[in-house]
């Protein structure tokens, strides 16, 4: 979800949900990858077939292969990459209103653009040797682009912050 402001006014608010799959196949020392957001079974079957055919026509690389089974992770450490907080659009708008007012405080400022974006992801890795692990991650990003003008020139600059946890955004 993202909210965008321009010159202290709400410009747009977007939400999108994406679901996709990525498939990598190995044949000997050959490897290829393919991805799709069409998760219908018949498409997945076609996707796998295409990936295998592509792999057959890919040059060998001595470093391409699945890891030995004894090297596979047994546990995945929690790296604290996920914050399940969901910030309401009203809160994003309030944050951006304060940001835009602060950014426009100098009379030389002629244009401002600010945005607040919230992303959530779920990653799963599985292979034919029985490995299947995953993790969730989140991202909260605030950014601002400011244009200043005086008698002789115009200058543009930006600032942003991106954190896994909402509480870490200043």
Residue ranges and their predicted role:
Residues 1-170:
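Active-site bordering "gate/hinge" segments
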């Amino acid at each position: 979800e993202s909210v965008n402001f321009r010159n202290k006014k709400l410009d747009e608010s977007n939400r999108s949900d994406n679901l996709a799959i990525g498939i990598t196949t190995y044949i000997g020392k050959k490897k290829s990858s393919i991805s799709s957001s069409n998760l219908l079974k018949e498409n997945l079957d076609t996707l796998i077939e295409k990936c295998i055919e592509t792999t057959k026509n890919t040059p060998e690389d001595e470093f391409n292969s699945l890891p030995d089974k004894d090297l596979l992770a047994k546990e995945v450490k929690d790296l604290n990459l996920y914050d399940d907080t969901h910030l309401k659009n009203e809160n994003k708008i309030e944050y951006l209103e304060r940001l835009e007012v602060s950014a426009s405080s100098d009379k030389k400022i002629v244009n401002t653009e600010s945005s607040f974006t919230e992303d959530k992801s779920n990653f799963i890795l599985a292979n034919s040797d029985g490995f299947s692990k995953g993790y969730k991650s989140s991202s909260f990003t605030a950014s601002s682009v400011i244009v200043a003008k005086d008698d002789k020139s115009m200058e543009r600059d930006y600032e942003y912050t991106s954190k896994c946890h909402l509480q870490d955004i200043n």
